[in-house]
Amino acid sequence: PGYVGIPFPDTEVRIANPDNLDETQPDGTEGEVLARGPQIFKGYLNNEEATEAAFHGEWFRTGDMGVMEEDGFIRLVSRIKEIIITGGFNVYPGEVEEILREHPSIDDVAVVGRPREDGSEDVVACLDLADGTALDPEGLKEYCRERLTRYKVPRTFYHFEELAKDQMGKIRRREVQADLIRRLEAEKD
C-alpha cells in the first residue's frame, strides 16, 4: 500500500464502486482500481475465461483497492484478495499494518484473517517485535483503538520470530496466514 502517483499519459484510471463497477467513486473514497489505455495488455493468450475475469468492458481490473486523491494521485489500500471480512465489514490489512508499524515495539507486521466457524474471519496481527520488547496485547489494542475504527482493531496479536517474506523483503501474507493456522492447530493438540 502507498502512493503510486498519477496515471501515465494516455492512460485513464478510475476508482470504481466494488459493488457496481460502472459507478465511479468520488475522490477520497475507496474502491476498485480500473485502468485503460494503449499500453494495457489486451488479454491472456489462449485463455478467454481469464481475460473476461480481468476486464470490465474495456477497463482492466488491477486487483487493487485504492483511493483517487483530489490532486489526482492514486493511493493503493490493499489487494482485493487480501480483504478480511469481519462482522460484515471489509478490513484492508495494509491500513491496519500502517498504523502498527508506527508503534515503537514493532519491527514488522502482517495483518491476516483468522478463519471462524461461521465463515467470517477475525482480524489478527502477526508481529515481529523489536529486540528486547515483550508482547503487550492490551497495550497494542489500546494503541489501535485510538487510531482505527473499532472493527479494524486486531482481536489477537501473535509474536513471530520471523515473518515470511519474498526475495524483495515484502511480507507474504498468505504464507504468514498459513503459518498462523498451522501454529493454532499445533496448539490445539
Language-model features: locations:
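General small-molecule cofactor/ligand-binding pocket signal
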Residues: 157-160
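Conserved AMP-binding/adenylate-forming
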Residues: 1-74, 81-83, 96-97, 132
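Acidic/polar alpha-helix N-cap and adjacent early helical turns
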Residues: 178-189
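Residue-level detector of flexible, active-site-proximal loop/helix-junction positions
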Residues: 15, 20, 90, 164, ...
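AMP-binding/adenylate-forming catalytic core of the ANL superfamily
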Residues: 37, 42-43, 65-152, 162-164, ...
